[in-house]
Amino acid sequence: MKAKIIITPKKAVLDPQGKTVQNALAQMGYPGVGAVHVGKYLEIELAGADREAARRQIDEACHKLLSNPVIEDYRFEIE
C-alpha cells in the first residue's frame, strides 16, 4: 500500500513562500495569478494489507510528526 499525503498552510496563516511565488509569477509576466499556497507532498510505502490500520498510522504520523497542526492542515489517501 501507499499513502499519498498533502500538507498545506491553514487558510488563516500567512504563507510567505506562497506570496513570494505569486510575486515572482507576476514579475515574469503571468497575468491573473491569484493566491499561491506552497505545501508539501509525501508518498509513504506501507507494509501490510489492513487499510484501516494504515489509515490510523498515517493520521497519527501526520499529526505528531509530518505536519504542524497549529499552522498546517493535512489530507491523505491510501492506495
What role is predicted for each listed range?
Residues 2-41, 53-79:
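Long, contiguous binding/interaction regions
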Residues 45:
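A short acidic, helix-capping loop that chelates divalent metal ions and anchors anionic groups
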